[in-house]
Amino acid sequence: MNLAGKTFAVWGLTFKPKTNDMRMSPAITIINFLLEFGAKVKAFDPKGFEQAKNIWGDKITYAKNSYDALEGADCLLLLTEWNEFRRPDFDKVKELMKSPIIFDGRNQYDGDRLIQRGFEYSCVGKRFK
C-alpha cells in the first residue's frame, strides 16, 4: 500500500473527548505511521492542538474546523468521539473529500447508511459488504 502523498483528515487527537490530554491517544501511533510512509495529515481537535504541536510541530496541518480538515482528503479518520463529530453533514463531507472513504475508529456512524450514500466505510470489529 502506497501512502506517499495521500492526505488523511483526522478528527480527534486527544484520547477522549472534553480534554486536551493526548497521553496514550491512538492518534499518536496512527499519525506517526502515516507520516513515516509519506502521507499528509490535516487534523482537527477542539482542545488538543497545543499538545499536538509539541508532538508534531509543523509536520501536520492544523485545520480551522472539522470541515476544513476534509478539503481534498483521500480518507477521513475519526479517532475521538467529540460531540461535534457525531452528526456531520455527510453531503458536505463527501463534497469536500477527494475520495469518500471513512475509517470510524469509534464505531460512531451507521456504516450501512454511509455505504448506501456512496462512502467506503470501515470501523473497528465489523465487516461491511
Which role fits each region the language model picked out?
Residues 1-129:
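Structural/interface elements that position substrates and couple domains in central-metabolism enzymes
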